[in-house]
């Protein structure tokens, strides 16, 4: 059963629409669905709400520590409410998946994502669930003939808003993720994965 859903992103209006904030977009939608508002909760270093979703009580969290210190926020809440790593779902942007794709997985490495890296370090565990929201990689924007030796600027890419057509398919992927939240929250994660991964 999932008791805590974390959205990763950077605080501040200048980052709201950037690719790196895709995790925030999902949690914002969940808060709207639950008819609740995320509020600044200093003891958890983030915006927090306790929500009733699909008949269950769920904690929603958006760390306000900047991405590379997200673990500080997650562990503060998890320890306070005695939530185990495998009861946590972290929604985050995923460079290695194209815009419009979304996948669930348990555990694994950070894939170079600093937010995941810090959460793993603070929880002393990789065994938490991830909802990977595809944002694409800047190398995909380089013509194939020019890719050899090219060094795309990943940091700049994730801190820019998606193009309009990318935003549309990212929004659609978040809608697909929201559609499986009843199973996710109830702990039927294998079923949720089958349903989500059936729709690329």
From Swiss-Prot:
Active site per UniProt: 20 (proton acceptor)
SUPFAM superfamilies documented for this protein: Peptidyl-tRNA hydrolase-like (SSF53178)
Keyword RNA-binding: yes
EC number(s) per entry: 3.1.1.29
Record has Ribosomal protein as a keyword: no
Biological function: Hydrolyzes ribosome-free peptidyl-tRNAs (with 1 or more amino acids incorporated), which drop off the ribosome during protein synthesis, or as a result of ribosome stalling. Catalyzes the release of premature peptidyl moieties from peptidyl-tRNA molecules trapped in stalled 50S ribosomal subunits, and thus maintains levels of free tRNAs and 50S ribosomes.
Protein name: Peptidyl-tRNA hydrolase
Taxonomic source organism: Paraburkholderia xenovorans (strain LB400)
